[in-house]
């Protein structure tokens, strides 16, 4: 596939944004025409992620074409308007949620992983690929947020090894942690 559109769920989180952006960076490094469409606002805490400004929201009435639509971190029906707006030759769904309805034409589903970004890490390695710092930063962010910064019970030795691999590339966990834990004034006041 030469043209690839990546998407994820409405109400995007670290794993959905990290997996789509990280894979976008990787695919572009392989010479592919890759873009990210997400049918929702992107939370401000993710503004530190490389390429965040390139995430597009599908424009009403606009048709998008691609050789491949990759739906990350969610089943197809939770992508908002994206699924209806994209004409793709093939649809691939990559997810770690056991609740996935398995409706995609092609599905890579593995609930043993803590995050879709952890799956992406292994898929890139399985293809013999390597990570740029931009892709590694995005994938690390998704793994960190879906594991509560490696505190939740879904954190496995494999998760930690994958995170360590990304840190060796140059990811700065402290910068990501501080950015993800920042709260807006309204969020702080809501807790008072």
Which residues are covered by each model-predicted region?
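Anionic-ligand anchoring segments at beta-strand to alpha-helix junctions in alpha/beta enzyme folds, i.e.
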Residues: 4-65
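Short glycine/serine/threonine/alanine-rich loop segments
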Residues: 32, 89, 129
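A structured phosphate/pyrophosphate-recognition subdomain
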Residues: 1-10, 22-28, 102-192
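Active-site cofactor/cluster-binding pocket
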Residues: 50-52, 58-106
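Generic beta-sheet signal
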Residues: 37-39, 72, 94-96, 111, ...
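Divalent metal-coordination and catalytic microenvironments
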Residues: 13, 23, 46, 70, ...
């Amino acid at each position: 596939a030469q043209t690839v559109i990546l998407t994820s769920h409405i109400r995007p989180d670290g794993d959905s944004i990290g997996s789509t952006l990280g894979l976008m960076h990787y695919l572009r490094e392989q010479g592919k025409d890759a873009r990210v469409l997400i049918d929702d606002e992107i939370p401000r805490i993710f503004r530190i992620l490389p390429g965040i400004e390139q995430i597009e929201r599908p424009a009403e009435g606009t048709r998008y074409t691609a050789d491949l639509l990759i739906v990350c971190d969610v089943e197809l029906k939770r992508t908002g308007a994206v699924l209806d707006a994209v004409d793709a030759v093939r649809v691939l769904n990559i997810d770690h949620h056991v609740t996935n309805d398995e409706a995609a034409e092609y599905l890579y589903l593995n609930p043993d992983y803590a995050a879709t970004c952890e799956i992406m890490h292994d898929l890139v390695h399985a293809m013999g690929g390597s990570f740029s710092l931009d892709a590694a930063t995005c994938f690390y962010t998704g793994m960190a947020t879906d594991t509560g910064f490696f505190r939740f019970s879904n954190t496995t030795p494999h998760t930690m090894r994958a995170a360590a691999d990304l840190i060796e590339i140059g990811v700065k966990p402290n910068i990501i942690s501080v950015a993800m834990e920042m709260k807006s004034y309204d969020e702080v006041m809501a807790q008072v």
